[in-house]
Design a protein with these regions (language model features):
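Iron-sulfur-associated redox domains of electron-transfer enzymes in respiratory
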Residues: 1-148
Length: 148
């Protein structure tokens, strides 16, 4: 077994994609992944920016039209088995970006939640969700990774 295969087998590699929003969820995702308080590296959860090395795709924010194709390409580049986490209310249901009412009307700049673009395995609601909730959501996605 080569070095790359060994590393992939013995760790979970998470890739984070920020689509559109206030960045509150992005901060909490990074707190969950990189903060010494949670220290996920001790559990072999590592951050990657290469979709070919990722096992878990973490998406935050409502998806604008400009991100549809890039998000699909990233998803397709991640090898099986893979899990997708939609983190935050914007990623889960579109939140204020798609649910505008009154004089403002419907926002035509956004597609909506992540599941309208790619399949989502775990939804972590909240504005912004706590790092503990993000970690719990990631744990719920682990069984799918173990299927292969």
């Amino acid at each position: 077994m080569g070095l790359k295969a060994t590393a992939r087998k013995n760790a979970i590699h998470a890739m984070v994609v920020y689509t559109e929003g206030c960045n509150g969820c992005d901060i909490e995702v990074l707190n969950a992944l990189l903060s010494p308080r949670y220290d996920l590296e001790q559990y072999r959860v590592l951050l990657t920016w290469n979709p070919r090395e990722a096992d878990v795709l973490i998406v935050s924010g409502c998806v604008p039209w400009q991100m549809v194709e890039p998000l699909k390409k990233i998803y397709e580049m991640i090898p099986e088995p893979k899990a997708v986490l939609a983190v935050g209310s914007c990623a889960v249901n579109g939140n204020v970006f798609t649910n505008m009412v009154g004089d403002i009307g419907i926002n035509e700049e956004v597609v909506g939640p992540v599941e309208k673009v790619i399949p989502v395995d775990v939804k972590v609601p909240g504005c912004a969700p706590r790092p503990e909730d993000i970690i719990a959501g990631a744990v719920r996605g682990v069984p799918k990774l173990m299927e292969a």
